[in-house]
């Protein structure tokens, strides 16, 4: 028996716009030595058919900046560290790939984040502030958030996929 696709989801909800990938997914996709590279590639492959049907995997400003920054970090990348122009070229090649798009931050993301911050039941620690923003961007754009970080389950997201290694 084969395992279900990690990208499996009802076709109707896929029609809502695709996925907003967390930085950890983009990084795992491009760095072969990353411990989650295999899982990220499986997710990417599982979404191939959806991309041909017009569904997209999205960057946003936070994930674009984060990917370029991390690819240039010697402590993270070791001997594979990149210079800024090379890291930017990797981002650009991903952005130009079929089925990859850019989700623009909107005022509705601000409103979503504000509602979550004022919701005492969420009790968001400061360490999740960037995650809260990414979740708000996904929710306000009707995108499914995809991450390796289980902390995203804390947010009242309509659609979230937490990948496992």
Name each region found by the language model.
Residues 22, 127-128, 149, 161-165:
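Histidine- and aromatic-rich ligand-binding microenvironments
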Residues 59-64, 86, 109, 130:
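Short, conserved alpha-helical segments within structured domains
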Residues 89-92:
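Acidic, glycine-rich loop-and-strand cores that form catalytic or ligand-binding grooves
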Residues 152-158:
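Short loop/helix-cap segments at secondary-structure boundaries that form the rim of catalytic
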Residues 2-4, 14, 97-146:
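Active-site neighborhoods of divalent-metal-dependent phosphate/nucleic-acid chemistry enzymes
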Residues 1-59, 71-86:
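Short, well-structured N-terminal submotif of metal-dependent ribonuclease cores
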Residues 20, 57-60, 102-104, 145-147, ...:
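A structural signal for short, well-ordered beta-strand segments and their strand-loop junctions
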């Amino acid at each position: 028996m084969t395992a279900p696709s990690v990208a499996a989801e009802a076709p109707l909800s896929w029609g809502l716009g695709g996925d907003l990938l967390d930085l950890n997914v983009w990084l795992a996709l491009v760095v072969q030595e990353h411990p989650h590279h295999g899982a990220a590639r499986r997710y990417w492959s599982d979404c191939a058919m959806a991309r041909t049907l017009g569904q997209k995997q999205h960057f946003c400003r936070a994930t674009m900046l984060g990917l370029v920054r991390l690819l240039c970090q010697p402590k993270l990348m070791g001997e594979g560290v990149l210079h800024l122009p090379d890291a930017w070229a990797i981002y650009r090649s991903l952005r130009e790939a079929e089925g990859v798009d850019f989700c623009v931050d909107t005022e509705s993301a601000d409103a979503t984040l504000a509602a979550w911050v004022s919701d005492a039941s969420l009790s968001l620690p400061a360490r999740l502030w960037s995650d809260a923003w990414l979740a708000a961007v996904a929710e306000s754009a009707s995108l499914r958030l995809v991450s390796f970080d289980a902390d995203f389950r804390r947010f009242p997201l309509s659609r979230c996929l937490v990948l496992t290694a």
